[in-house]
Every structure is written in C-alpha cells, then in structure tokens.
C-alpha cells in the first residue's frame, strides 16, 4: 500500500491508492461556471443532500432521510438533514457567488448519531458500465470553523479496486492551501469502472476526538468521461513522433 500526498498545495488531503483510480481537487469554486457542471456532460448521478438544486441547468435530485434517488443508496445507522442553513459559512468571504452553487451547498445530509470515531456512511452508485471512465465529485464547504475540523476517511470501491483519501471537511483553507476556510471545492475521483456499482464510504477516523462530526453530503455528481477518438489518438501519437524526430 503506497501513501501519496497529492502535492504541497493540497496537503490537507492524503490519498492511498491500491490501483489505478486517481484523486484531484478543484480550484476554489466561485461562479456556477467554475463548477464545471454542464448540461453538455453525460451524468449517471447528480445528487443533492437535503433539498434539490439546479446548477447550470443540471438538476441535482433530493436525497434526504425521507426520499430516495434512482440507482443511489445512502446507508447509515442514523439519517438526518439540515436545509437552507449556512451556519458559520459565509459564501461571499469565500468568493462564492453562483446562485446554483450556493443552493447546492446550503443543504446537506449527515449521520446524526454517527459523529464518533468509527462511524460510517455509505453512498452507493448503481447502474454503472464496466470499462467506462467516470469522474465522481463531492462538493464541499465548511460548517464549523472550530472543533475538530471534521476529519473524514473516504474509501471508493468498485469491484476489486479500492482507493482511499482522508482530509478535513471543515477546513477548505487547509485542503486547498489558501488559508480561506470559507472557500468551496470539489474532490474528484477518476476511475475506469470494474463493476456496475461504486461504493463510497465516509468514516470518522478512529483517531478522531469523540463527537468529531460525521460527513456532510452537500452534493455529488458522477459523469462519463468520453474515450479519446481514434483520430485524436492518431494525432497525439503523430505529434509525439514529430517531437522525437526533432530532438
């Protein structure tokens, strides 16, 4: 098992990869356009915790304790949501101005009885196609500037492949290396699916303080990444060949 710090800028998240899936972090999200969410993308899942939201014409379906989303399962010993509540987060301080983005980040689900070390929530995305490349994104902002920082261990599993990453959900400024905890961002997991289901486990670390806090699920998307066309590959290989001959 190889432990990888993504880079010095995003040292707030540490990844452990057993196979080929890769993690990355967005730049701070500001406008709706900055999210990369687009009706031109092909999505298998767009899920909003607590209340539905629409960003750039893409509808994020409401996942709450009383509702379900097709091909999406939330498993938790306890289920709660908080709606239209920014708490200590000040969007303007973080440069967040997009109305759709703010709507997505203003509500979330969480495990009310799962704030202690070892407590886990699972989010399962069904209906995937084996061999297809996907980007799964978790949209994140802070809730509480004090306390533990809300450390979370994430584990992404599809078939025989498991990739893990850990970080402080309530400390975007640490994660992004900017020092501004009011910023928002997304965690991206790119993988070639080995199964028809992706399971995402969000666990309060064993070393966390009692009552550290469960994962807040504001929004999630899973989009298809098209394979490069044969023409694109041919052009790329041709350019590589030209570059080698010129050396």
Model-derived regions, located:
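Sec/Tat signal peptide C-region and signal peptidase I cleavage site
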Residues: 16-20
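Contiguous ligand/interfacial binding patches
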Residues: 21-43, 141-224
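Extracellular and analogous surface-interaction loops
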Residues: 122-133, 188-196
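Sec-dependent signal peptide recognition
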Residues: 2-11, 229-233
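A short, hydrophobic C-terminal helix/tail in secreted or cell-surface proteins
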Residues: 227-244
């Amino acid at each position: 098992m190889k432990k990888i710090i993504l880079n010095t800028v995003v040292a707030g998240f540490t990844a452990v990869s057993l196979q080929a899936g890769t993690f990355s972090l967005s730049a701070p999200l500001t406008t709706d356009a900055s999210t990369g969410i687009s009706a031109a993308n092909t999505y298998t899942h767009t899920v909003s915790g607590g209340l539905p939201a629409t960003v750039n014409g893409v509808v994020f379906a409401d996942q709450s304790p009383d509702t379900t989303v097709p091909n999406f399962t939330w498993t938790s010993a306890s289920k709660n949501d908080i709606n239209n509540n920014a708490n200590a987060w000040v969007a303007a301080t973080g440069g967040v101005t997009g109305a759709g983005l703010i709507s997505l980040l203003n509500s979330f689900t969480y495990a009310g009885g799962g704030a202690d070390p070892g407590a886990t929530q699972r989010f399962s995305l069904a209906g995937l196609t084996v061999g297809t490349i996907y980007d799964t994104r978790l949209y994140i902002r802070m809730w509480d500037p004090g306390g533990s920082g809300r450390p979370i261990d994430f584990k992404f599993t599809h078939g025989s492949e498991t990739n893990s990453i850990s970080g402080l959900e309530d400390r975007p400024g640490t994660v992004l290396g900017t020092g501004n905890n009011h910023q928002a961002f997304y965690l991206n997991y790119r993988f070639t699916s080995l199964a028809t289901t992706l399971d995402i486990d969000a666990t309060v670390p064993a070393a966390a303080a009692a009552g550290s806090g469960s994962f807040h699920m504001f929004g999630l998307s899973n989009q298809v990444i098209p394979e490069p066309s044969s023409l694109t590959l041919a052009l790329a290989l041709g350019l590589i060949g030209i570059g080698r001959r010129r050396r």
